[in-house]
Curated annotation (Swiss-Prot):
Keywords: Cytoplasm, Developmental protein, Differentiation, Gonadal differentiation, Nucleus, Spermatogenesis. This is Testis-specific Y-encoded protein 2. One of its GO terms (molecular function) is histone binding. GO terms for cellular component: chromatin; cytoplasm; nucleus. May be involved in sperm differentiation and proliferation. It comes from Homo sapiens. The keyword Flavoprotein does not apply. It is found in: Cytoplasm; Nucleus. Its main location: cytoplasm. Belongs to the nucleosome assembly protein (NAP) family. Signal peptide: none annotated. The gene is TSPY2.
Length: 308
């Protein structure tokens, strides 16, 4: 009687019917008990002549090989069954957790609105923090800018040289413009970024034969792509120069410094405003001196020759 839960494997026909002298059948029974683990019991019943020992030995070797094959097969099947069982458990666990499921357009918009409502105070807090930081940095810059302005006052014609030496501005300035700029004593740029981004350019002049203004202010609204003219101080030309100013403004319709200076809404004037605000004002010293081109037939040395 086999133990309950045991697995029985029968030896193939080639082992059950051997070629012994009497032609009697040999039978092997292998019992693998599930409770005993890997214990196997093999019983062989032989009928025939007792003197044929060599054939019995051959049959024994084949039986051992068969048992090895059976055990290997059982191990492979057990591993496959365990893998399948683990996959099924994972699938059941995944199905047990309720997922969000597909969202309809209406529910997606509701969810988006809820997220946006939560995001608004975060954005407002970030704007306030950025504004406070910007104001803090402006306060730190102001004493340095004031000191720089005071030092520039001691350098005659500083701003005239800076503007005339700038690679882009130099193409927009005539000899008459340079003479007018020679009376310029200071340049200041202020930026306001509270409600709108406003760039204010202030040009300070000493007494000159062209106009009466001591300060000329030009304001521009700034966005990502451009500087847009907002306000400008009207220029009070002296009567002796007013006719010439009119002639210059209408004689040359291309963009130049005089047209920008005298006509705030002149096409392309935002280009000059951007150069003054973003480049010249931030570091004018780099344009105060310019490189002198090497003379023909001379070699350039390591030391740069500068012109003021």
């Amino acid at each position: 009687m086999r133990p309950e839960g045991s697995l029985t494997y029968r030896v193939p026909e080639r082992l059950r019917q051997g070629s012994c002298g009497v032609g009697r059948a040999a039978q092997a029974l292998v019992c693998a008990s599930a409770k005993e683990g890997t214990a196997f019991r093999m019983e062989a019943v032989q009928e025939g002549a007792a003197g044929v020992e060599s054939e019995q030995a051959a049959l024994g070797e084949e039986a051992v090989l068969l048992l090895d094959d059976i055990m290997a097969e059982v191990e492979v099947v057990a591993e496959e069954e365990g893998l399948v069982e683990r996959r099924e458990e994972a699938q059941r666990a995944q199905q047990a957790v309720p997922g969000p499921g597909p969202m309809t357009p209406e529910s997606a918009l509701e969810e988006l609105l809820a997220v946006q409502v939560e995001l608004e105070p975060v954005n407002a807090q970030a704007r306030k923090a950025f504004s406070r930081q910007r104001e803090k940095m402006e306060r730190r810059r102001k004493p340095h800018l004031d000191r720089r302005g005071a030092v520039i006052q001691s350098v005659p014609g500083f701003w005239a040289n800076v503007i005339a030496n700038h690679p882009q501005m130099s193409a927009l300035i005539t000899d008459e413009d340079e003479d007018m700029l020679s009376y310029m004593v200071s340049l200041e740029v202020e930026e306001e970024k509270h409600r709108v981004h406003l760039c204010k350019i202030m040009l300070f002049f000493r007494s000159n034969p062209y106009f009466q203004n001591k300060v000329i202010t030009k304001e521009y609204l700034v966005n990502i792509t451009e500087y847009r003219a907002s306000h400008s101080t009207p220029i009070e030309w002296y009567p002796d120069y007013e006719v010439e100013a009119y002639r210059r403004r209408h004689h040359n319709s291309s963009l130049n410094f005089f047209n920008w200076f005298s006509d705030h809404n002149f096409a392309g004037s935002n280009k000059i405003a951007e150069i003054l605000c973003k480049d010249l004002w931030r570091n004018p010293l780099q344009y105060y001196k310019r490189m002198k081109p090497p003379e023909e037939g001379t070699e350039t040395s390591g030391d740069s020759q500068l012109l003021s």
